[in-house]
Amino acid sequence: MKTFLLYAVTAVAEVVGCYLPWRWLKEGGSIWLLVPGALSLALFAWLLTLHGTAAGRVYAAYGGVYVAVAIAWLWCVDKVRPTLWDAAGVAFTLAGMAIIAFQPRV
């Protein structure tokens, strides 16, 4: 559970770090959105270093959680209800994440 929570916090940091510049560019938000966006991306990079395995495996497993957080963001922030296809995609990516992240350590 601790691993999944760390992946989720990492994903939120990345989504926020990408969303704020997107808002600035796409919706004409303040240029000051770039400051917390950059800080959030720096936090994201630092959080990735806290995962206790090889970088490539961390990135692969993290990708599944990122998809889940992005779809949650779609629903909570963008106010767009996810489709059944979105839910199925999240389920498959989380299954892949679990296979990678929780494999037996030898």
UniProtKB/Swiss-Prot annotation:
One of its GO terms (cellular component) is plasma membrane. It is a multi-pass membrane protein. It is found in: Cell inner membrane. Keywords: Cell inner membrane, Cell membrane, Membrane, Transmembrane, Transmembrane helix. Signal peptide: none annotated. It comes from the Bacteria. InterPro entries: UPF0060. It holds the Pfam family UPF0060. The chain crosses the membrane at residues 2-22, 30-50, 58-78, 82-102. Belongs to the UPF0060 family. This is UPF0060 membrane protein Bphyt_4776. It comes from Paraburkholderia phytofirmans (strain DSM 17436 / LMG 22146 / PsJN). The lineage of its organism: Bacteria, Pseudomonadati, Pseudomonadota, Betaproteobacteria, Burkholderiales.
